[in-house]
Curated annotation (Swiss-Prot):
It holds the Pfam family Epimerase. The keyword Isomerase applies. This is ADP-L-glycero-D-manno-heptose-6-epimerase. Its cofactor is NADP(+). It comes from the Bacteria. Pathway: Nucleotide-sugar biosynthesis; ADP-L-glycero-beta-D-manno-heptose biosynthesis; ADP-L-glycero-beta-D-manno-heptose from D-glycero-beta-D-manno-heptose 7-phosphate: step 4/4. SUPFAM superfamilies: NAD(P)-binding Rossmann-fold domains. Disulfide bonds: none annotated.
Length: 330
């Protein structure tokens, strides 16, 4: 009886593989698109039973070729909020997901998929309800529209369907994402390359480096996925963040102080980091002004009601662990 993970060579998918392996699960079918061959690195240390291209997988899954499937973790998508090709985005994120949902419901396979906090757009209420959902870009819209499809399917569903709205996830195995990698990743790379970190300046009433996001460690994201895997009677759409909004300044400072701690140097305050030149700012890009989420913070009420009780890592401990991983991987 297999477990299937789409997007298995991606950031969250590959971390989910690692979490499953730690449980002793190895009968796993990994599904992805390895056109970017370098992403094989995220699979190389995972124990899996098979690999399939995402296009070959779709038809075979619909036919029931894989026998009894314990769960399908659908993590595959185009995750670029800067992608402007709406036709590509809707086919890759929306239509593909719809086909997997339909097949999963017909086969009775638990279906756990990645949604996104991008569905909330520029709003200040991050609750899983239609009135708060106003995406700012076609990526957010593709996730939003599929969530609506799921909401219509849930009342008649005879097997588990779970959507997890990921907030700002950071952690190991994201380097292939380039510009879409986390703030923590880019801060670390800037610091190692240039000896300083540079953040966006003032925008939308927020001071330099003061934009607020809900940053959540990828290890916590994997744990929440496995919580629902362990409780197949629970369905719905749930926020997945830390439940706390932190500034980009705090992320940058956590990275700076983590690197300093690894070099046996004392921590700095934000003011000290700025005055020493380790942290600076640049003008906010004009191209992002109309489609930028300046503030996010997950409302975790529904997730807690669904039985998830574990604490989330603090930003400081999560970033410290991530910086150690990056240093080992250099």
């Amino acid at each position: 009886m297999s477990i299937i993970v789409t997007g298995a060579a991606g950031f969250i998918g590959s971390n989910l593989l690692q979490a499953l392996n730690r449980r002793g699960e190895t009968d796993i079918i990994a599904v992805d698109d390895l056109t970017d061959g370098e992403q094989f690195r995220n699979l190389a240390d995972a124990d899996i039973a098979d690999y399939l291209d995402q296009n070959d997988f779709l038809e075979r899954y619909a036919r029931g070729d894989f026998g009894t499937v314990r769960a399908l973790f659908h993590q595959g998508a185009c995750a670029s909020t800067l992608e402007s090709n709406g036709r590509y985005m809707m086919e890759n994120n929306y239509r593909y997901s719809c086909r997997l949902l339909e097949s999963s419901l017909e086969l009775g396979v638990p279906f756990l998929y990645a949604s996104s906090a991008a569905v909330y757009g520029a709003g200040r209420t991050f609750r899983e309800a239609r009135q708060y959902e106003r995406p700012l870009n076609v990526y957010g819209y593709s996730k939003f529209l599929f969530d609506q499809r799921v909401r219509r399917a849930l009342p008649q569903a005879r097997s588990q369907v779970v959507g997890l709205r990921y907030f700002n996830v950071y952690g190991p195995r994201e380097e292939h994402k380039g510009r879409m990698a986390s703030v923590a990743y880019h801060c670390y790379q800037q610091l190692r390359r240039d000896g300083r970190v540079e953040l966006f300046g003032e925008h939308g009433g927020f001071p330099p480096g003061g934009h607020l996001r809900d940053f959540v460690a990828v290890e916590d994201v994997a744990r929440v996925n496995l919580h629902f895997f362990d409780h197949p009677q629970r369905s719905g759409i749930f926020n997945l963040g830390s439940g706390q909004a932190r500034t980009f300044n705090e992320v940058a400072l956590a990275v700076i102080n983590s690197v300093r701690a690894n070099a046996d140097q004392p921590p700095l305050s934000l003011q000290q980091a700025v005055e020493s030149g380790l942290l600076g700012y640049r003008e906010f890009p004009e191209s992002l002004r109309a489609r930028y989420q300046s503030h996010t913070c997950a409302d975790l009420e529904l997730l807690r009601e669904a039985g998830y009780r574990d604490d989330f890592q603090s930003l400081e401990e999560g970033v410290a662990g991530y910086c150690r991983w990056l240093a080992r991987s250099a």
